[in-house]
């Protein structure tokens, strides 16, 4: 489905990604983890077309999409819930979800997807008429994910879904990420919380200083001495 091949990218003259290669398969949950500043968000932005590549390529469903305009990436079946949530605060929960389905012309399908998101996140159903700015941080994260799902993506990109969210809500959100994957979408989740991400991902890539430092099945990484010591605090 998604392949990054030897991707080099950055901002202006500052190259921050140095030969990133990774893969996400159909209906698979993959984690991209590592410390702040490792280049995880930049990697997602290369996929969505927000950051131009200076080397390598991004391939999606066997097609090179490097350099694709941001607005065209959604039409390929890729959707992103960015870091910081970025919901429309002056719109209601329902209106935010409708905005997420702006490419969907079938009204019945829009209604069906909204109903599914409300079943996934009952709190949003309870607050469907509230302004997004009145929601808690966790509820806004639910809304941001729901809005990203509205386009019916085959690949969902999630950037730091646990950031600024209460632990009890984070656990609930991660359970729903698994449900989204089971419903048919592959998921690439970026996280600083390594243990949390590895618990739901089939495979993971550990990124440090713009490079992939480790990769493999999550179960193996959870028993890796470097991961245990550096990220999970287990000596």
Regions found by a protein language model. Give the residues of each.
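Helix-to-loop junction immediately C-terminal to a conserved catalytic motif
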Residues: 48
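ABC-type ATPase nucleotide-binding domains, specifically the catalytic core motifs of the NBD
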Residues: 12, 30, 68, 93-112, ...
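The feature captures the beta-strand-to-loop junction immediately N-terminal to the Walker
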Residues: 33-35
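ABC ATPase C-loop
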Residues: 148-149
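Conserved ABC transporter NBD signature motif
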Residues: 56-65, 76, 109-114
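Conserved ABC ATPase signature
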Residues: 131-135, 139
């Amino acid at each position: 489905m998604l392949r990054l091949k030897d991707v080099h990218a950055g901002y202006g003259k500052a190259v921050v990604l140095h030969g990133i290669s990774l893969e996400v398969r159909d209906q698979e949950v993959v984690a991209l983890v590592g410390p702040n500043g490792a280049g995880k968000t930049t990697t997602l932005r290369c996929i969505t077309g927000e950051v131009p590549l200076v080397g390598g390529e991004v391939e999606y469903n066997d097609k090179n999409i490097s350099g694709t305009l941001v607005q065209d990436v959604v039409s390929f079946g890729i959707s992103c819930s960015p870091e910081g949530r970025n919901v429309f605060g002056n719109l209601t929960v329902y209106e935010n979800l409708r905005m997420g389905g702006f490419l969907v012309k079938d009204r019945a399908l829009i209604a069906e997807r909204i109903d599914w998101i409300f079943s996934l996140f009952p709190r949003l159903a309870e607050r469907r008429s509230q302004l997004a700015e009145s929601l808690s941080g966790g509820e806004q994260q639910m809304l941001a994910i729901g809005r990203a799902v509205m386009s019916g993506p085959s690949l969902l990109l999630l950037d730091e879904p646990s950031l600024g969210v209460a632990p009890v809500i984070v656990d609930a959100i991660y359970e729903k990420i698994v449900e989204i994957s089971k419903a048919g979408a592959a998921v690439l989740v970026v996280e600083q919380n390594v243990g949390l991400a590895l618990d739901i991902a089939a495979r993971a890539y550990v990124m440090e200083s713009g490079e992939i430092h480790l990769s493999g099945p999550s179960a193996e990484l959870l028993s890796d001495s470097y991961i245990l010591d550096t990220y999970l605090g287990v000596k």
